Design a protein with these regions (language model features):
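Conserved FAD-binding catalytic core of PHBH/FMO-like flavoproteins
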Residues: 1-64, 73
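Structural motif of enzymes handling amino- and sulfur-group chemistry
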Residues: 19, 106-110
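Short, histidine-centered active-site or binding-site loop motifs used for metal coordination
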Residues: 23-27, 87-88, 94
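C-terminal helical "tail/cap" subdomain of flavin- and related membrane-associated enzymes
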Residues: 26, 49-56, 96, 111-190
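FAD-binding beta-loop-beta segment adjacent to the flavin cofactor pocket
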Residues: 66-89
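Active-site micro-motifs of SAM-dependent methyltransferase domains
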Residues: 89-90, 135
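A conserved FAD-binding loop/helix module that cradles the flavin
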Residues: 93-103
Length: 190
């Protein structure tokens, strides 16, 4: 991850020859506004380091502009209709929590259905929404906090020096030692 005054840039290795990159762009931009040359120029600029590392250009195989949005449906059930995964909640990709939440929903719903149909006990099934919403809101809070940390912007989408310093102080706390770092690690991995 690179926090830069021109916006966030991310470099995620997928293999020894393939990487996924992320660039923060102004709201309202379209894919057409980002030709390959502009993408590589901004990546080189935002990911620049003080050592001998350099970005290796290659073909851009896919381009998308992602609208960062989040929502939660409460409750996650209506009568006998139970919602799980993206049908119940959408998160920003920050922190990569969507699939974990969907699997947690599916597991809890499956356990509730098994108890309902095999043991004639509907307690867990009736508690499904309340049980899962606690985890959903924890993940939403983490995802949105991480999004703000990585993409925090000020007036007209440009980082404000004060906000930038606050973000950098927060990063120092979560990458160091102590309770905030442990809490962040638990939330990021868990």
């Amino acid at each position: 991850y690179a926090l830069h005054q021109d916006g966030f840039a991310g470099h995620m290795l997928r293999s020894s020859t393939v990487s996924r990159y992320y660039l923060q762009c102004p709201a309202g931009d379209q894919v057409e506004d980002w030709p390959d040359d502009r993408i590589w120029s901004q990546l080189r600029h935002r990911l620049a380091t003080d050592d001998d590392w350099s970005l290796q250009d290659g073909p851009v195989v896919e381009k998308n502009i992602l609208e960062m949005r989040s929502w939660v449906t409460e409750p996650m059930q209506f009568g006998k209709l139970y919602l799980a995964g993206d049908a119940a909640h959408i998160l920003t990709p920050a922190g990569a929590k969507g699939m974990n939440l969907a699997l947690g929903d599916a597991r809890e719903l499956a356990l509730g259905l098994v108890e309902h149909y095999h043991k004639a006990d509907s307690t867990r099934l009736k508690a499904y929404s309340a049980t899962r919403l606690a985890a959903v809101w924890r993940a939403q809070e983490f995802s949105n906090s991480l999004l703000d940390l990585l993409h925090g912007t000020g007036v007209e989408g440009l980082p404000v020096p004060f906000a930038d310093r606050l973000r950098r102080a927060a990063i120092e706390q979560i990458t160091g030692e102590g309770p905030r770092a442990r809490s962040f690690a638990d939330s990021y991995v868990g």
